[in-house]
Amino acid sequence: MITPRTSSETLTLPSPQPDSTLKNPTFSDSGCHECGFRLWIPVAESCHSTLGIYNDARFPGRSIIRLKEHFEDLSDVPLETLTGFMRDIQVAQKAIRAAVRAARVNVAILGNRESHVHAHLIPRFPETEDFPDCSPWNDQRKKTPLRPERVHALVDQINAQITVADRRRSSSKPAPIKPPTQVASSQLTLF
């Protein structure tokens, strides 16, 4: 479960969270102890990940979600951690989409610049973007930061959507997540 952070909170170091729900972080992201990768503006955290706003006025609500534990490649992440991370991405993606009323939220997991496993969540607004078919990295508009009051509003809006999702989830009994059936490597078909 994701726990939101209010924009007016004092940030202090967290105590470990026993569950996998995104929650309100009570800290500034001190970064990975191994590589130093950190988020700009923390929004929410779970036992697996931390969500933060990437300050880019071209894509209001653009965020990064990073694994708390250091892994350099997605294929090295244990299944339980990866499942929790993907669940957090899904919750964050839905919250951002609803908060900023985006047509969609692109998810990109690259690892070319930062070796720490993380995902970019980029709200897209094709009806108002000059280049809706191009990736955010190729967007020709000048990258500028959001005004501080807009950042605080986004934190609050995303948190409100995370809270709504959490209430819905707690009122319905979720189906247990089962690991995928083991497949012998000889059964895998490569394209």
Where are the regions that the model predicts?
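HIT superfamily nucleotide-processing domains
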Residues: I2-F191
